[in-house]
């Protein structure tokens, strides 16, 4: 039996539950109680909120460089290859971090990993703010990427394992919340850029990117301060490790469920535990998981490639379309993210319990393909009409991302595998997705330099591949009791 730190002693819980006793005789009983989710879930919602806080920080750190990359290029006199190195360093770190984080999430538990990874963000953010050259900056961004990579598998595990199975706020909706959280973080980074752009004297405008990158340490410190008070281990993972008493304790504290383990269950021989190992990565390509892994991987790769090329390059794209000021670029980028990507993400959370992740992803890719083909045809806008149409196409792309694959690729990654494989499943998915991000972030400056707006013809291949993949593999993770596969 795996030894588990009593994380519940750190979680506030209010009064002890006094309702009907729910007897927990095995891990399947714990999963069923979580899936039903019919009783008070105040602390469970707090855990989900803190997990989303980690995702918020991931998004902020990944997107914070978008407006500063031009200033960094000028300050350090970077070539296109050097710009790509700085821009992609964080995703290189995330590739390594996701593999390690996925394994550790299954090996030592969600709680321990979640409590530790914020250190990467604090140290790296401060190092970025004071980087004397591009090499220190790239190194600090790599360390920051390690934190992002480690954080996402464990955050997705919490979102999956602290939500009910069906109905409003189900597992798919909980996981989809990562999407509007992501866009909220991007929008806040834009607002911070706008604020500091307004208050910094022109003689110190080169401080802007340093302040924005360094600011990431503040939310990390806040999360460190509050997560130790409210976080607890996943009851599903604890039960899966054979620790029913720990799982029942978490259910009482986080869910207000009066769960107890009967004495006869405690007297039973220790159950066979699904031990985490590096070989579990191979299990993702065996049996029924091969088909799911293939779909989740394809969707994540193409979605990440297209989104990073467009969203990271959004300020560059807008300033290319409209030879305007930095202020105009910031305001248009902020409006597009809030009105379309963020709103699309909120709709995804609300509608996925009804329509499912598969159909909503299909609709999102269709929107993106239409938008990218429109941008490719328009090229560099001439006149107001073409300029407005180009911005409308960018808006359609971002709405399709928020409504479709942006929200639901994580559902395919998180809810295609049971508890015993969820960490490595998300870890592998993130590794491959970040590889796609690295490629797009590195290639985007080079492609734009050589192809200008014709680059949209290349990017349009991504949603096309997503559409074909969904039509070829019709797997719906929403509403399916995936954790039951550990007990069959």
Q: Can you annotate each of these PLM segments?
A:
Residues 2-488:
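Transmembrane-helix signature of 12-pass secondary carriers
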């Amino acid at each position: 039996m795996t030894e588990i730190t009593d994380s519940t002693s750190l979680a506030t819980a209010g009064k002890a539950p006094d309702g009907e006793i729910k007897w927990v005789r095995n891990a399947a009983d714990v999963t069923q109680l979580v899936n039903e989710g019919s009783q008070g879930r105040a602390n469970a919602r707090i855990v989900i909120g803190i997990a989303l806080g980690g995702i918020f920080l991931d998004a902020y750190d990944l997107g914070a460089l978008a407006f500063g990359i031009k200033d960094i290029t000028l300050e350090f006199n970077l070539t296109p290859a050097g710009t790509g190195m700085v821009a992609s360093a964080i995703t290189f770190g995330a590739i390594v971090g996701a593999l390690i984080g996925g394994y550790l999430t299954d090996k030592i538990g969600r709680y321990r990993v979640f409590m530790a990874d914020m250190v990467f963000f604090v140290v790296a953010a401060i190092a970025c703010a004071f980087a004397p050259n591009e090499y220190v900056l790239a190194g600090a961004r790599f360390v920051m990427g390690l934190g992002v990579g480690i954080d996402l598998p464990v955050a997705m595990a919490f979102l999956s394992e602290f939500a009910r199975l069906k109905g409003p706020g189900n597992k798919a909706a909980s996981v989809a919340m990562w999407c509007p959280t992501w866009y909220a973080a991007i929008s806040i980074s834009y607002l911070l850029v706008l604020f500091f752009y307004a208050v910094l004297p022109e003689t110190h405008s080169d401080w802007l990117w340093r302040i924005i990158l360094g600011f990431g340490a503040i939310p990390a410190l806040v999360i460190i301060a509050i997560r130790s008070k409210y976080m607890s281990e996943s009851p599903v993972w604890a039960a899966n490790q054979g620790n029913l008493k720990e799982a029942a304790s978490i259910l009482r504290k986080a869910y207000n469920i009066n769960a107890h383990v009967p004495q006869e269950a405690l007297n039973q021989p220790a159950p066979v535990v699904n031990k985490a190992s590096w070989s579990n990565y191979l299990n993702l390509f065996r049996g029924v998981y091969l088909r799911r892994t293939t779909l989740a991987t394809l969707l994540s790769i193409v979605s990440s490639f297209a989104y990073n090329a467009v969203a990271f390059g959004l300020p560059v794209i807008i300033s290319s379309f409209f030879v305007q000021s930095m202020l105009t670029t910031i305001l248009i980028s902020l409006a597009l993210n809030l009105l379309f990507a963020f709103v699309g993400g909120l709709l995804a959370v609300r509608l996925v319990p009804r329509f499912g992740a598969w159909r909503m992803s299909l609709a999102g890719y269709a929107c993106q393909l239409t938008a990218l083909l429109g941008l490719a045809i328009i090229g560099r806008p001439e006149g107001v009409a073409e300029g407005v149409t180009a911005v409308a196409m960018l808006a359609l792309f971002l709405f399709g991302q928020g409504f479709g694959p942006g929200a639901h690729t994580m559902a395919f990654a998180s809810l295609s595998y049971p508890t015993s494989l969820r960490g490595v499943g998300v870890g592998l998915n993130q590794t491959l997705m970040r590889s796609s991000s690295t490629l797009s972030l590195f290639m985007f400056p080079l492609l734009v330099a050589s192809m200008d707006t014709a680059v949209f013809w290349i990017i349009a291949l991504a949603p096309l591949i997503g559409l074909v993949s969904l039509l070829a593999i019709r797997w719906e993770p929403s509403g399916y009791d995936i954790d039951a596969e550990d007990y069959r």
